[in-house]
Amino acid sequence: MRIVLVFLVSIFYFWANISIALEETSYRVIAVNQIYEIREYDDRLAVQTSQKNGQNGAFRKLFKYISGSNISSTKIEMTTPVTQSIKIDMTTPVTQKFQDGEMIMKFFLPRKFQLKTAPQPLSEDLSIVVVKGGKYAVIKYSGRSTYKNFERHSKVLLEALATDKIKTVDHPIKATFNGPLTPFFLRRNEAMIRIEWF
């Protein structure tokens, strides 16, 4: 029993440290309260694709790209987070189910790449994009990276921003920092939304 326990702890430690070792998109924290923090991001380079009614196909396409399925056959280091957002009009109620629309998934590229030097995708379903910087309100949470968990925390974030009279300018984004083998209690997830902040 003790050997099994030591083995499980070792596995948990291994996967937790893999996540820590990945390059993370940089930002500056400019305000913090008990519920959320305000971050400022610079422009970032990402590869993105879309998927209707699910996320597995989108993830596979993006993972193949960083694994060398690009014009220069370049293998690219994985970074965090992987983000998912829904492609719907701003007039659509935020209460719409996240998985009901066309989902956009992004892998952010390592900082060493620029728009001119980023390996071009082989698949027409993928595109290299510049994600414009700006101010974001972010709420962190652990547990499984499910839509239900994301929607629950997004609601908490939106209600807190409304109470604080902070205007949002987009729909919430789901940010995932760990792989599926990371124990759920060690996972880091975030719901983030672009805001007007002066």
What are these regions (language model features)?
Residues 2-198:
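A solvent-exposed interaction/effector surface
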